[in-house]
């Protein structure tokens, strides 16, 4: 899987029509600081500084599919309450069809509250209903599925055992999918996977696979035996077992097992990782990918997701970037403004501090390199804004630049201290800074803080300006003068 092929896949995903059926939840996050112990009991006191609501459960599957570019309809049941209304409004903002979300005044909409401080989840509070649907509500859901499910490219069952995926609802789904051979992908729960008999693929994690098979998984041999038991009992064509830091393994009736290693990443939170896997697999299959290629896509996507805190989505730009970096191509560091803004936002979500600097960098020399190396030490990632050829001409005259923008960008991207290069057309980088919102704005020591373009903007949201000293006597102008003196 290379950059061109993954870009082509995302173009096809935009035409995919997906149906998600399952348990919806509202995920509430309370972000704060835990710097005190309560005088009432030996527990931490959290000072809340930010509150956030996210789509959870099957809603996170929907959110991931939308982020990947697919068209999505969701079928579920929520309570006739404020949390249920909040879910409907959130789906509306994402452009998700909600005609098949049924209100049930006898149910409580699931809401999970997570308290987070210093990038750690301290406690989770659950308010939810776990009882199966009433016979009347189950009939309404099943009737809708029978009438409509046959018109989708792929169907996803997201089971959190909160009562929506009753045997009747699952049976109606599988029956509706059968005539058109529509793939049905399931993120299962419980120990009896036979309830999903007739599905195309299940995506249990290792713990769930152990419980369903009755086999303790401690090596590849036991993993293969557990997979065989599950596939035989459920009558599956495919089974994907996720194995945390060991990646994932795909088992198919018509092919040998494929073990896909994980991409090494710092793990912040595994919340919703299974949702990401299910959504990525479905999107890939709807785009016409072979099962193994869809599994590789899911592996890459999940690796990005677990590096974020909380139930999070992964943008196509992040996946394309990960694929490009895996091919060790320094040119993959060169991004346009829109793509880079998405990547930088994702890096911030991982707690990374972003340093930004800019310049023409015509005739790269040792002074430039020393400056950039120092700037990189100010944070976790260094983004370099590079003046375009037209911008350089306006700033330095018609005879400059000596090196074209693409060549300059490729040379700079080859430096280990630079994480991203972005070319800008304006005379100043102000618009680029506004788009990226770096934590630190670095400029050469020949500036004063007041003279740095973007200082007021960066300081307005809590960032800062850092002046980095240059190497004396090193400049492009000096190099040009020496060349003219010696060779003219």
Curated annotation (Swiss-Prot):
Pathway, per record: Nucleotide-sugar biosynthesis; ADP-L-glycero-beta-D-manno-heptose biosynthesis; ADP-L-glycero-beta-D-manno-heptose from D-glycero-beta-D-manno-heptose 7-phosphate: step 1/4; Nucleotide-sugar biosynthesis; ADP-L-glycero-beta-D-manno-heptose biosynthesis; ADP-L-glycero-beta-D-manno-heptose from D-glycero-beta-D-manno-heptose 7-phosphate: step 3/4
Gene: hldE
Chain positions covered by the region annotation Cytidylyltransferase: 356-488
Annotated spans, Ribokinase: 1-330
GO MF entries: ATP binding; heptose 7-phosphate kinase activity; heptose-1-phosphate adenylyltransferase activity; phosphotransferase activity, alcohol group as acceptor
Top-level taxon of the source organism: Bacteria
Function: Catalyzes the ADP transfer from ATP to D-glycero-beta-D-manno-heptose 1-phosphate, yielding ADP-D-glycero-beta-D-manno-heptose.
Alphabetical UniProt keywords: ATP-binding, Carbohydrate metabolism, Kinase, Multifunctional enzyme, Nucleotide-binding, Nucleotidyltransferase, Transferase
Enzyme class: transferase
GO cellular component, one term: cytosol
Binding, ATP: 205-208
Organism of origin: Pelobacter propionicus (strain DSM 2379 / NBRC 103807 / OttBd1)
Catalytic activity: D-glycero-beta-D-manno-heptose 7-phosphate + ATP = D-glycero-beta-D-manno-heptose 1,7-bisphosphate + ADP + H(+); D-glycero-beta-D-manno-heptose 1-phosphate + ATP + H(+) = ADP-D-glycero-beta-D-manno-heptose + diphosphate
Protein name as it appears in the record: Bifunctional protein HldE
Keyword Metal-binding: no
